[in-house]
Amino acid sequence: MSTIEERVKKIIGEQLGVKQEEVVNTASFVEDLGADSLDTVELVMALEEEFDTEIPDEEAEKITTVQAAIDYINGHQA
């Protein structure tokens, strides 16, 4: 089984259509990876599905970087 970090990065790459090597922990979805607001909503939905969790809107708004997504999932896994 892949690590959470690997799974999160794979989803981000697929959702945003960027090369895996561009998905570094410090990358901002909007500024570095070219996401728009719809992309970020779809990304959160993909993360929710992959990790069988629900990310409240107020939390989703704080997830703006690759590392923030990894940290959120790590902190909310059963």
Swiss-Prot record:
Disulfide bonds: none
Any one biological process term the GO annotation gives: lipid A biosynthetic process
Domain of life: Bacteria
InterPro entries referenced in this protein's UniProt entry, alphabetically: ACP, ACP-like_sf, PP-bd_ACP, Ppantetheine_attach_site
Keyword ATP-binding: no
Modifications after synthesis and translation: 4'-phosphopantetheine is transferred from CoA to a specific serine of apo-ACP by AcpS. This modification is essential for activity because fatty acids are bound in thioester linkage to the sulfhydryl of the prosthetic group.
Sequence positions bearing O-(pantetheine 4'-phosphoryl)serine: 37
GO cellular component: cytosol; membrane
Keyword match Transit peptide: no
Pathway in which this enzyme or protein is active: Lipid metabolism; fatty acid biosynthesis
Subcellular location: Cytoplasm
Residue span, Carrier domain: 2-77
PROSITE patterns given in the database record: CARRIER, PHOSPHOPANTETHEINE
Signal peptide segment: none
Keywords, alphabetical: Cytoplasm, Fatty acid biosynthesis, Fatty acid metabolism, Lipid biosynthesis, Lipid metabolism, Phosphopantetheine, Phosphoprotein
GO molecular function, one term: acyl carrier activity
Stated role: Carrier of the growing fatty acid chain in fatty acid biosynthesis.
Family, similarity comment: Belongs to the acyl carrier protein (ACP) family.
Record's protein name: Acyl carrier protein
Lineage: Bacteria, Pseudomonadati, Pseudomonadota, Gammaproteobacteria, Enterobacterales
